[in-house]
């Protein structure tokens, strides 16, 4: 009998996951178009991709796209709460080694990543990394440096992971070429902005059933994620206060009509708090002590360092688990704090993450990055690179038909006047969308 080469919560959920996966495919035109374009040429043949990214239904479509293009794939989730167990089961049932389930411990999380390094069907180790947050990249560099010699490249999904890549490269610790997928326009301006715009409120409402209209919401950070969250909360009728360290982002927030102040001032008024910064220690003990009764506190940044959950656990008189990922802490001053997803990603811990369509944009970039690194590694020396503007525009183009968009075509006269090709790229690399 063959050895079981996966660990998921319940493999019997595979049929349920497959049904949702089929619905998601219809909402992910970019990935399906890439399959159709490259299925015959098999550009990822020989690639052994270890992926560490939220094991959701949308990620399942990404995994099956990589396999359709010739890759061997193993998978773990980049967050202990973000796995959708029916999605993990659906992929494991196809023979892809998946090590992920919702509610892993920290030890189990690292175990899952370790397992995927040596679980490829061919018996050979990984030679490509597809990462979200940088944990897989860091683990291979720190614990398994002997594997780095055969790894052709890394593609990184999120802001936090990209920050770590640039830091590693600056400190001469990065040993493999990497592509920054996060800062592709069709990722950052869509996934980070429009995705958070829908999934943040979904997570808060599923967790608490709270009425957002009329509340005061505090959003820490006004980058693309913060912009999406602030706009979303305002659209629900909340009065939104923004905190920022960057004067440019602060000015943007103010001119968008948001009040901008410090967290020390905002805690006196806020009832819903959302951290979006990618930085640590944004909401600390002194802030909790000033919050109103039953303030809702959550994070939508990648790691769980933005909210000082350790202080909350150490200093609370009592804690009651209301339901999965919803805990009510009683402080020594008698007031209560409602913490969502233990300070981790609220949209994935308390809901199902971003909608399929916007994830198709992000994941199409991931596939193109993997193809570029695998087939053309001479164009990507050691460092952190961006995908060419032409590919960024192609990702957008693949999603227009689904929305019924009709694109205008430049005339030859207009093309000459602007000095750009009729078929693009249409903007310089330094253009800010």
From Swiss-Prot:
Reactions that this protein is recorded to catalyse: S-adenosyl-L-homocysteine + H2O = L-homocysteine + adenosine
Cofactor annotation comment: Binds 1 NAD(+) per subunit.
The organism's place on the tree of life at top rank: Eukaryota
Residues bound to substrate: 56, 132, 157, 187, 191
Residues annotated for NAD(+) binding in this entry: 158-160, 192, 221-226, 244, 300-302, 347
Enzyme class, first EC level, given as a word: hydrolase
Family matches, as SMART domains: AdoHcyase, AdoHcyase_NAD
EC numbers for this chain: 3.13.2.1
Family per similarity comment: Belongs to the adenosylhomocysteinase family.
Alphabetized HAMAP family for the sequence: AdoHcyase
Role of this protein: Adenosylhomocysteine is a competitive inhibitor of S-adenosyl-L-methionine-dependent methyl transferase reactions; therefore adenosylhomocysteinase may play a key role in the control of methylations via regulation of the intracellular concentration of adenosylhomocysteine.
Name recorded for this polypeptide: Adenosylhomocysteinase
């Amino acid at each position: 009998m063959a050895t079981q080469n996966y660990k998921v919560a319940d493999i019997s959920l595979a049929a349920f996951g497959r049904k949702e996966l089929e619905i998601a495919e219809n909402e992910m035109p970019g990935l399906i178009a890439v399959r159709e374009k490259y299925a015959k040429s098999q550009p990822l043949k020989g690639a052994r991709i270890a992926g560490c990214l939220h094991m959701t239904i949308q990620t399942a479509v990404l995994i099956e796209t990589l396999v359709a293009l010739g890759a061997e794939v193993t998978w773990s989730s980049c967050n202990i709460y973000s796995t959708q167990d029916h999605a993990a089961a659906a992929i494991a049932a196809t023979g892809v080694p998946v090590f992920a389930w919702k509610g892993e411990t920290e030890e189990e999380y690292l175990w899952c990543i370790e397992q995927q390094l040596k679980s490829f069907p061919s018996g050979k180790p990984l030679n490509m990394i597809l990462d979200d947050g940088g944990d897989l990249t860091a683990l291979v560099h720190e614990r398994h440096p002997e594997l780095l010699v055969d790894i052709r490249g890394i593609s990184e999904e999120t802001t936090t992971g990209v920050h770590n890549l640039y830091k590693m490269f600056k400190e001469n610790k990065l040993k493999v070429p990497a592509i920054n997928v996060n800062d592709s326009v069709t990722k950052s301006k869509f996934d980070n902005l429009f995705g958070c715009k829908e999934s943040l409120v979904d997570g808060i409402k599923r967790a608490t059933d709270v009425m957002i209209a009329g509340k005061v919401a505090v959003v820490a950070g006004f980058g693309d994620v913060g912009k999406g969250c602030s706009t979303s909360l305002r659209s629900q009728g909340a009065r939104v206060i923004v905190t920022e360290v960057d004067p440019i982002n602060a000015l943007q927030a103010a001119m968008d009509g948001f009040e901008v102040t410090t967290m020390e001032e905002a805690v006196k008024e806020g009832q819903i708090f959302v951290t979006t910064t990618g930085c640590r220690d944004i909401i600390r003990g002194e802030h909790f002590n000033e919050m109103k009764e039953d303030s809702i506190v959550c994070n939508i940044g990648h790691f769980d360092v933005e909210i000082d959950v350790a202080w909350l656990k150490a200093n609370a008189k009592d804690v009651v688990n209301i339901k999965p990922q919803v805990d009510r802490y009683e402080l020594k001053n008698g007031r209560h704090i409602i913490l969502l997803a233990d300070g981790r990603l609220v949209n994935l811990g308390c809901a199902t993450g971003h909608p399929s369509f916007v994830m198709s944009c992000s994941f199409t970039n991931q596939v193109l990055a993997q193809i570029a690194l695998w087939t053309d590694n001479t164009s990507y020396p050691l460092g952190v690179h961006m995908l060419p503007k032409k590919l960024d525009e192609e990702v957008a183009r693949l999603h227009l038909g689904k929305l019924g968009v009709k694109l205008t075509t430049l005339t030859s006269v207009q093309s000459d006047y602007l000095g750009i090709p009729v078929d693009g790229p249409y903007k310089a690399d330094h253009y800010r969308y």
